[in-house]
Amino acid sequence: VYRAFFTTYLPARTVMAVAALPMDALVQVEALITNGEGTIPNEPQAGDLVKYVNNTHNAPYHALSTQTVAFSHYNNITGQLPIDPATGKMVEGGVAEQAAQCLKNIKAVLTSIDVPFDDIVKVNVFLTDLADVDAVNEVYTRFFPDSGIARAVAYMPARTIVPVAALPMHAKVQI
């Protein structure tokens, strides 16, 4: 069904399990839409909004999603699971090791498109157990802020922590 709607490119996506959805729905889809009103940085708008998609072998890849989709001044990254791209398997260890791998995967995707890690403005963290927040926070502060300039101003992106019933591959965290 997904490919029937996205025939020319695959948008970034995040998959999670929740305890319940409104009106007893079985599936809920969130979409970030652009109608073409916007410009590519430093370029005039010429007709349809250009979308750039990118996948790198330095982060996990899924056949039904693109790692990053850029449009206008925005770039959306698919939710990253704690998968080691070298093995295709989830990293060993607990939630701290999993959170670190998620952030390493995000950094690899950004590096592949020459975007600094500190350009991230919003992060969603999906956790299967809210008791793991402190462990995730400890790892998170090893990654943010990343650059000297960001450290000088104590930059941290906006962040939302979402409790979920389950994640793919029985992961404890997805970022």
Go through the PLM ranges and name each one.
Residues 1-104, 108-122, 126-175:
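N-terminal presequence-like segments and the immediate start of the first folded domain
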